[in-house]
Regions:
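Terminal low-complexity, intrinsically disordered regions
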Residues: 1-54
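A conserved regulatory-domain signal marking ACT and ACT-like small-molecule sensing domains
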Residues: 6, 48-172
Length: 172
C-alpha cells in the first residue's frame, strides 16, 4: 500500500484528524507524528494532498424542540413475556437497547430532542457532552427523536449543551 493510502486510512481511523483537515485547522507536522505511518515530511505532503480532496467543514442548524424529563431509570426489560405490566413498561420506554429500557422510576434525567434529528445530530451532542465532561448513561435516536440520559444534577447543563449542539451540526 502507498504512503498516501496508509495516511488516508490512518486519518479515517482518527475522526478528529479528519474533521480538523476539513476545517483547515490541522497542524500537519503534529498530525504526521501522531499518525506515525511514515517519514514526517512525506506524511505531511500526503495530508496536504488529502485535505485538498475533502469538502470544507460545514455545519447547519437543526430544528428541534429540546425538553427534559426527570425521574427515569434503566431497568432490565426482560420480564416475562405477555404480562401486562411489562408490556406497558416496554411501550412507555424512552429507549431500549439490549434488553435494558429507560423508563419512569429512577434518578436519571432524560433530555429529549424532537424534530430534525438523526445519528449525526446525536454524535454532535455526544461529542460536546464529552468535552464538557458530562457522563452519559444512555443515548439513542430514532424516528425524529433523540434521547440522552444523564444523572439528575447534569440535566440542566445537558439541555443547554444539546440545544447548542443542534444549532451547528456538522454536515457530511
Amino acid at each position: 500500500m502507498s504512503l498516501a493510502a496508509d495516511t488516508r486510512r490512518a486519518v479515517r481511523r482518527n475522526p478528529f484528524v479528519h474533521r480538523a483537515l476539513r476545517a483547515g485547522v490541522l497542524n500537519y507536522a503534529a498530525a504526521a507524528r501522531f499518525l506515525d505511518v511514515g517519514e514526517t515530511d512525506a506524511v505531511v505532503a500526503a495530508l496536504r494532498r488529502y485535505a485538498e480532496d475533502l469538502p470544507e467543514y460545514e455545519t447547519a442548524p437543526r430544528e428541534a424542540r429540546v425538553t427534559m424529563r426527570s425521574g427515569l431509570g434503566a431497568e432490565d426489560g426482560s420480564g416475562s413475556e405477555g404480562s401486562g405490566a411489562d408490556d406497558r413498561e416496554s411501550e412507555d420506554a424512552l429507549l431500549a437497547v439490549g434488553g435494558v429500557e429507560l423508563v419512569d422510576g429512577g434518578s436519571l434525567t432524560g433530555v429529549l430532542a424532537t424534530g430534525d434529528v438523526d445519528a449525526r445530530a446525536l454524535a454532535s451532542a455526544l461529542d460536546r457532552l464529552a468535552v464538557a465532561d458530562v457522563p452519559v448513561v444512555a443515548a439513542g435516536v430514532a424516528s425524529e427523536t433523540l434521547v440522552v440520559a444523564v444523572e439528575r444534577r447534569d440535566g440542566p447543563d445537558t439541555v443547554r449543551i444539546v440545544e447548542d449542539a443542534l444549532s451547528a451540526v456538522p454536515e457530511a
